[in-house]
């Protein structure tokens, strides 16, 4: 499989739940060091039963927004990002994510920060967001492997239910009014 490539037919075997992993890192995208968070997320998502594409390793900022928009257009159920959520001048992932979200889900990043803060007080500095764009759930995770593990621990009991809810799950979708009536 190529970086960010897809294996045909894999998502059908996973109940149709498809996920994309995007790593936001100026240095990893330039080859300065290896992305460790993205593969960890991909492994975790596979363990949850998702067919996973990526990680796509891109510089922070506009390339992250482009990857999110492409993932939404491709119909992924979930897009998890890692990196770019801190407070350094180059951390722009929350800002570009906010531009694509239609509905915010503040409880998810709050839970991730609270979970991480129990072990590492600086987890409170993460500015990650979560929300829905189209029919895609997007969640920003920190760039550290510890932050990724914390995020996956919080997401594991939530993701499949969230995807089912976004799809209409146990709640009927609104019926459009018949213009003839």
Model-predicted segments: where are they?
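Non-catalytic beta/alpha edge segments that cap or flank active sites
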Residues: 1-181
